[in-house]
Amino acid sequence: MTTIERITTPRIRIFDTTLRDGEQSPGCSMSPPQKLVMARALDELGVDIIETGFPASSQSDREAMALIGRELRRPSLSLAVLSRCLQADIETSARALEAAANPRLHVFLSTSPLHREHKLRMTREQVLESVRKHVSLARSYIDDVEFSAEDATRTELDYLIEVARVAIAAGATTINLPDTVGFTTPEEIRAMFQQVIAGVADVPNAANVIFSAHCHNDLGLAVANSLAAIEGGARQVECTVNGIGERAGNCSLEEIAMVLKVRQAFYEQDSSINTPRIVGTSQLLQRLVGMPVQRNKAIVGANAFAHESGIHQHGMLRHRGTYEIMRPEDVGWEDSQMVLGRHSGRAAVEARLRALGFWLDEDELKLVFEQFKGLCEQQRVVTDADLQTLMQGGSNAQGYRLASMTISDVGSRANALVELSDPDGNRVAETAQGDGPVDALFGALSAATGVQLMLDSYHVHSVGIGADARGEANLSVRHEGVEYDGTGTSKDIIEASALAWLDVANRLLRQRQATAHNSTDVPTPATA
């Protein structure tokens, strides 16, 4: 039997629904073995409840529940499955939960006027009777039963209170009030939780019931609404890793966990999340479902702890608290990133050069900084290899340059011929075939340069207006396990793609040159 803690406990339960609601995001389906891998990571992350799927909907979800239930036996971990308010669904779900050490049966029914009339075609009284009947049935199988009033935030408040009273009287141990379509606002959901909790206070055992928030992100308010629900009395938040889910997604687990950690003094609540595992869990999910997060995603995005502004970098060098409210290592990143680009100042460039072993006097630094600024006009980001090349006097800094290219069709495939000028000024020509013009182009560039790149993502868009518009190609690639980004701009999008590819290849070339140079001539730091 699962012990239900009182709502006064100063801890927010994290109900992870990545494997159920998150998986409903287009393109994010997972096989049972993949779900098991993800469930292991969620267990290590420290979530309180893992919703593994919807057993009545597929054999795959039943298999996943069996795999996960047999392996994950942590006493403080509950495993949940979702069920409609239908006898057959509940019986199927109860059987699926037999493998779980601490099972939870999660039943739901729509309660809003829109859903009652157009989806269920049921009256208010019929919905109440269905809740009473099916929560009681679920409780006859499982001691821990959660009831969700689907579309709660668009349900009449007096009726929502009545539904919650019936569900609690029938044996529900958790009442979930979902913002199913991401419609509500923080002020509204805070008041809703306060009034529903007050409205059920006299129902027997209501003091032991946990109220839960499940917020969608259609208006970008899922995390804000979940926090407001906590202020209103919710003690469970339903969320997903990386915020994946239907439409615009769900409340982001990593964001809610870090808000509670960073602002613990304000919310006077915490969670059981092992936060240094957040980034690893996020990256595992990205690999499993093939859905990367945007670079500026809070907590887990590549830019979450990256600083390019010169003012910010200068402050960070003096005290990291000037521009960071949490430490990157607290969520699983190794360290903050000082991204050197056109917004960077001399202090950041000098600090990076010293980290690379180059100690310069004021005149030397002034000269190198001018060269650095010139390089920033040619590329978005300046890497360690670029700095090392500057310190070597810029030898071969130009790298490979595109001289010409020809794309043609060969039956159902494309053929690319590229001619490059190598770093020494020699001409190199290579051809390759591919499934399309870009695939063939990248193959020919690889043959010409000897650089092998694994493409992760690629997109093009227009820059400028009218006749002055140019195509910009952006790609992310991997080389020997390291991720690189490249950018190219041209009137022709295929040429822009070639320039983006060469942007990365030339960076790797400079890196090799710098490594070779340093292996024979390592600069000695000045003594203090």
Curated annotation (Swiss-Prot):
Subcellular location: Cytoplasm
Chain residue ranges for the region called Regulatory domain: 401-528
Keywords: Amino-acid biosynthesis, Branched-chain amino acid biosynthesis, Cytoplasm, Leucine biosynthesis, Manganese, Metal-binding, Transferase
Coiled coil spans: none
Keyword Lipid biosynthesis part of the UniProt annotation: no
Name of this protein: 2-isopropylmalate synthase
Family: Belongs to the alpha-IPM synthase/homocitrate synthase family. LeuA type 1 subfamily.
Catalytic activity: 3-methyl-2-oxobutanoate + acetyl-CoA + H2O = (2S)-2-isopropylmalate + CoA + H(+)
A cellular-component GO term for this protein: cytosol
Entries under Gene3D superfamilies matching the protein: 1.10.238.260, 3.30.160.270, Aldolase class I
